[in-house]
């Protein structure tokens, strides 16, 4: 099964996973609209790939009050939009053993960037995807292996990714059991640590000289793309695969039982996953 989507909105496209995925989708023939805050990087992205294969929209998704108008403009400009990738994210260290050092505005910024903004984006973009029926459409979330097993250093980040992982399960079940929405697939990519600027931007990690760790971006994209091309709805990548298989089977069985009781018989939440 090939990647089915031809007009993709990539949230968080100026670096790292988002940029690498966007470029792989362009290579496969998709038109990808990159979204981010850094105009110079967005301009470079379009210049590299050409306006016939790429476009850009400078936007800060944490500006929640502006998302509705921005989403309406995106839909008007790109009516063929059939896939939204929710990828942007930030990570900060958080130590509850030193509560006086906790910066609550930074904590809230992390929650807004990694989770709350996605709710608003889905609310305002999903109606367009629903209206495309029966043509296929997709919402792709990029969570983290830390959604499955957290690490103490970045407790809030892990919590936001766990929330996103849970959201994907419930949203997938809801859409699969709704006649007007069942053509909209909910796909979750679950990365391990990847060598991106996510770690390089953290002062405490830079101070330790501990920013270059994890899977290379090239290896990550190759593995993630294989899952997207297969049509998987859950795509654990690299070392996350073993953790995913060890932890999620029992939870999946329990969740499918809940879905059957509450939403009636139909596709299980994991329908289409490998």
Kindly give the residue locations of the regions a language model identified.
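Conserved glycine-rich cofactor-binding loop
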Residues: 12-15
């Amino acid at each position: 099964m090939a990647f089915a989507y031809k007009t993709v909105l990539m949230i968080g496209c100026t670096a790292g996973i988002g940029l690498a995925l966007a470029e792989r989708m362009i290579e496969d023939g998709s038109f990808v609209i990159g979204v981010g805050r850094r105009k110079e990087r967005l301009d470079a992205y379009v210049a590299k790939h050409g306006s016939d294969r790429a476009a850009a929209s400078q936007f800060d998704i944490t500006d929640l009050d502006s998302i509705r108008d921005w989403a309406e403009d995106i839909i008007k400009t790109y009516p063929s939009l059939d896939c939204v990738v929710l990828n942007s994210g930030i990570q900060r260290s958080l130590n509850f053993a030193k509560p006086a050092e906790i910066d609550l505005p930074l904590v809230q910024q992390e929650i807004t960037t990694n989770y709350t903004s996605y709710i608003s984006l889905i609310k305002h973009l999903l109606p367009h995807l629903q209206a495309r029926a029966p043509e296929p459409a997709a919402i792709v979330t990029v969570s983290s292996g830390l959604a499955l097993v957290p690490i103490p250093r970045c407790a809030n980040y892990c919590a936001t990714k766990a929330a996103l992982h849970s959201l994907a399960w419930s949203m997938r079940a809801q859409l699969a059991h709704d006649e007007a929405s069942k053509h909209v697939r909910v796909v979750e990519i679950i990365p391990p640590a990847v060598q991106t600027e996510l770690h390089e931007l953290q002062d405490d990690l830079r101070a330790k000289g501990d920013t270059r760790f994890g899977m290379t971006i090239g290896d990550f994209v190759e593995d993630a793309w294989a899952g997207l091309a297969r049509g998987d709805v859950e795509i654990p990548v690299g070392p996350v695969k073993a953790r995913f298989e060890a932890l999620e089977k029992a939870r999946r069985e329990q969740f499918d039982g809940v879905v059957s009781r509450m939403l009636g018989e139909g596709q299980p939440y994991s329908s289409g996953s490998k």
